[in-house]
């Protein structure tokens, strides 16, 4: 046993300046062995044993050194050779004897720190307890010190030795003095040192700390009060007990690890090699802890020895803590009772402790000097019954600091002991600087709560302890439901709220659960610290017991049929394939089925929360996962259905619920293990109580059928709910057939298809080289020429009244196909190949066509590229076509452009009524009739089998076959064809086409379908770029009246003309004025919509009247259009007075000026936020649209402030949302920007806060109320059936458009509102 000896100085009560050095020299002359290193140069202080290599440093130190300092000598050289230790003669007086005892005790205690052997590596700790009694003289004290290394010494026996320990330990017990026996401590000076063992608040261990209070108190030289000394002694004993408990837990962990690594059953006597190989880092740390704890215990026993030498030999009863009840209890517990030291020493000989002690020291029997000095930590293991039994919950007094012993070893060694820091200090300092220099006050504050790893400083020890877990990886708090671990209790509280819905009867475990208990199997199969069986077994268990073998793998999640898309997502995380039953759920690729999917989804969603609340599903233990980590497959807010281990549950195909009768029993078992009922009241008042109440309220209230069961978000409808589920699953069912990209919604797919679509240039009219028919879409023209070449269309010029239904058909086919995706199952779209459409039987009457899906040529974006493609036609047709296209490029539009286009509506109507009388009104022109329908050959009934030939969509007909199957037209698009698709398969894909689902509200150019004709009319202006509504202030044009009205609000009142607020009845309809009457304005709208009137500034002078349709239109439709030559954009003539920027309009300048003034006139009527522009407000309003109707989603939102109409007439505006009608009718915000128009807006109704200017969905309920005249003449678009529209209902599309032309009293306004759907403005 290597010991590092230091020359022992003798203390004199005389003047320290005179007596200390001679005494030290005298000791050296008496023949005491000196230290092995630098014995001649070292100068040792006679009071504190501090050594100095310079005499001047020693003299300087003695000025500040006080008597009776306790010195902790840190082991710096564990490999030093052992030396003999000769005792010095006893001192002459009793005071010297007392001081001599203290010094000897310190020397023995410090020498114990230098022991590095196998016993230390096995977490053993030597606590030498030298005792001085009254009858023992100085000789007995000296002999005790001299025989300390021997195996038969009394100190070795008292420290819990092995088999060679002597049994007579009761004679050498350490007793604590009573209060009355400390009166003789008058000469005992206060301990004044940098290092002191003090009782720290909120800690459970003895910590060597720099204490400013102790140093300041010691500087005054005052005497230590007896109560304070007793308090320190009692606190020291209590802390020592907690340290021994810590070592017991460390020993248990090492034995467990050793048994696991060696694949041997856990034995009580593991070999030294096994411990070295399995727990090498733990052995090093435990050795370090053993030294430090031995020093702490040695100090405690040295204090007790001093008290015992003064008070006498009489046996003292055990001293209890002041707050604890008095008694003669022996077994220490976590409650804090301080046992007597002699009981701890005598407990070594008990049979229960001898077994553990002998097992710990079995590998050291060969060393006679060590065999009898086993660790007292093992000796006290029998006394620490609560800590040694891992089945019992650890009380908060012990486990709040050491909740999990394995990661906390480094924390304790690095943070809670200053001895290692002192050792590092001494090693880093120069030899002439003492290691015990006092630090400054600021340094002490930093040193007290400073992280040893990253040097971060914290304000409290608890914050430091939590921070240290980030270094050690300790997660002491365990969720008793899913088994996840957390570093703090607050994180566990937040996490546990996610389980409240599924497990409302299970309470959270607020106590730390040691991590090593996770690997210990139990008889019930439920791991320690958990209330229910884990949903997947832990792979690191010693014996893999099945978890609840009564539960089979047939138990699964209660997934409703609305969540079939979650099944493949869950399957991807399963290690083994699991057969999924499709009896209760839809196919994995299908989200919506044709047979009442939403209804069944509603029922399942409605019934799910009650099932989830009443009967919670236990997990199946039939399979295991490779990793032991608990992973979240979906957001954990959905713990009611998809909690974190949901990826490993049973087959998701079984939609049955299972009531687990064991859950109440498991909850009671958990309560028995963790008696924390009193803590739940405080948890209710925590920061998570509001969240918990919110979750409970959600459980209690009636669930919305459109509520997401994962995040509890309420959607507007079932389709929106299904699209929302894709955000959780990551599913993208809608794939582009051209490029393969997938999208979550069909709207995104349709938006994406615009990338592939070849849009014609602005105002380009393509003329057929055969019949001179005009088309605005090049793809439509190609199909038209194909029909010419196939003989389906006569190669003679058609009259003006010829049907233009082909253009309607082919143009609307572009994107009607994707609008129809709502009406067929997504399974069909998923299962079919990406580059094709499933083949279906073809009609015998319909002409065959070849469709293939290939990438669309980029050359289709220009007319020049179209010319190159059309060179494949024969020479004669190619010359005519090229000449026509070149003329179009040069801008020389032929004279019959307007006539041909404007006659399209009438001709369309005549052709359909004459050629297909069997066609119902509901199918009209949306049936994509070919020009050959006048022969009545194909149209017997609107059945799918007898569908006429359809046009080629630009998405699918990217490569038309150059050799059609049945004599079709030439290939005008691509020279390569891929997969041949039969044309009538589209009839199967779009089954609602012949059922009147789509009326004549499809755009002939881009194929979009709208809910009403007025929306289609407004949409056509996006293609023609017509802006018929002109602002009289800045001459800007707008496509809709609503946009013009919104724009007018940007002008100040002084800018508005005075005639704006007066009736304009004095203006004649034929007057060529800048003021356009309402009747001529409506005529302009109709003729533009029906005939694509393109009035350019240069043509408006030569063309005072436009060509009107030849069909039976109303008289107002033939009224002249008097539109002056107004420029589209004026030069920049508006200047900002602040920064000098120029703008082309006053509205742009006004918006710009708001950046200088900070004005935000556009306020949100929902949340009150204000914005500088209406566009920003529109974007913001999208954040409030999550619970709106489907028509509101993804559409253009027109946000108007609560302004009233400019005039005194009652106004009825369109309202898209029925649920907002009652709340928003008549509402006005007086604090908004519109107050400046109070004079003009005093009379009339308030405008609604939200309106859709472009309606793209059907199913809009009509607003109740008077619609005015019920027999007004509507106007149809290009595809309109005029006869049907004339006999339509008053609430039919565009039913009130004529009200603007002929109002009841003949009073017209320039700001007459454009009518949308069945809502109108009644002007009087």
Curated annotation (Swiss-Prot):
Q: Where is the composition biased (Basic and acidic residues)?
A: 22-42, 113-124, 937-949
UniProt lists compositionally biased (Acidic residues) regions at: 820-833
Q: Could you tell me the keywords of this UniProt record?
A: Deafness, DNA-binding, Isopeptide bond, Metal-binding, Nucleus, Phosphoprotein, Repeat, Repressor, Transcription, Transcription regulation, Ubl conjugation, Zinc, Zinc-finger
On whether Repeat is a keyword of this UniProt record, the answer is yes
For the keyword Zinc, the answer is: yes
Annotated Pfam families = zf-C2H2 (PF00096), zf-met (PF12874)
Highest taxon of the lineage: Eukaryota
Where do Polar residues bias regions lie?
321-336, 802-811, 899-936, 1105-1119
Where can this protein be found?
Nucleus
Residue location of crosslink Glycyl lysine isopeptide (Lys-Gly) (interchain with G-Cter in SUMO2): 439, 673, 690, 701, 947, 982, 1086, 1219, 1299, 1319
So what does this one do? Transcriptional repressor involved in organogenesis. Plays an essential role in ureteric bud invasion during kidney development.
Subunit structure as annotated in this protein's UniProt entry: May associate with NuRD histone deacetylase complex (HDAC). Interacts with components of HDAC complex including HDAC1, HDAC2, RBBP4, RBPP7, MTA1 and MTA2. Interacts with CCNQ. Interacts with NSD2 (via PHD-type zinc fingers 1, 2 and 3).
- Kindly provide the name given to this protein in its UniProt entry: Sal-like protein 1
Per the UniProt entry, what species is this protein from, by scientific name?
A: Homo sapiens (Human)
